[in-house]
Amino acid sequence: MDKLADLNYTLSVITSMNDTLHSIIEDPGMAYFTYIASVLTVLFTLHKASIPTMKIALKTSKCSYKVLKYCIVTIINTFLKLAGYKEQVTTKDEIEQQMDRIVKEMRRQLEMIDKLTTREIEQVELLKRIHDNLITRTVDVIDMSKEFNQKNIKTLDEWESGKNPYEPSEVTASM
């Protein structure tokens, strides 16, 4: 690991890259030289910049691991987007957050189902009581003395002048 930050090691890597690039240039049929050179340059820069940064970040704080992890995931997702892929790499923390959100939603729905089930049970009990109250019971003798309509009944003989007071009479109107 100490070789990564060493100047001589860096120069030897640059020299080997230059030798590789010069051998590619000598081939006249090489049409993708600029693309290969830019990719190699980016990879070398990432290699040289990320290793010492990771060392320093890991030594200074404990949360730097998460920061580096998110940086690496972002870089990988960028490469995937450049390559045309729609899929993305996710970290374990993001998956855990999504799982927590799903579990919360499931708990909320279970509580709602529990409340609805309790209400339905109460409604069934209420309907049973109403049904029990509506069931007709057979009675042998009906006592009509307690009926309101039966107290003031008069027969035709008991009416004054023997005439039904509820029958309409003829009315003469002047014009």
UniProtKB/Swiss-Prot annotation:
The N-glycosyl content is primarily Man(9)GlcNAc, with a small amount of Man(8)GlcNAc. InterPro entries: Rotavirus_NSP4. Residues 1-28 are lumenal. The keyword Glycoprotein applies. It holds the Pfam family Rota_NSP4. Keywords: Activation of host autophagy by virus, Calcium, Enterotoxin, Glycoprotein, Host endoplasmic reticulum, Host membrane, Host-virus interaction, Ion channel, Ion transport, Membrane, Metal-binding, Secreted, Signal-anchor, Toxin, Transmembrane, Transmembrane helix, Transport, Viral ion channel, Virulence. It is a single-pass type III membrane protein. It is found in: Host rough endoplasmic reticulum membrane; Host membrane, Host caveola; Secreted. Homotetramer. Interacts with the immature particle in the viroplasm. Interacts with host CAV1, early and late in infection. Interacts with host integrin ITGA1/ITGB1 heterodimer. Interacts with host integrin ITGA2/ITGB1 heterodimer. Interaction with microtubules blocks trafficking to the Golgi apparatus. Binds 1 calcium ion per tetramer. Plays an essential role in the virus replication cycle by acting as a viroporin. Creates a pore in the host endoplasmic reticulum and as a consequence releases Ca(2+) in the cytoplasm of infected cell. In turn, high levels of cytoplasmic calcium trigger membrane trafficking and transport of viral ER-associated proteins to viroplasms, sites of viral genome replication and immature particle assembly. This is Non-structural glycoprotein 4. It comes from Rotavirus A (strain RVA/Human/Venezuela/M37/1982/G1P2A[6]) (RV-A).
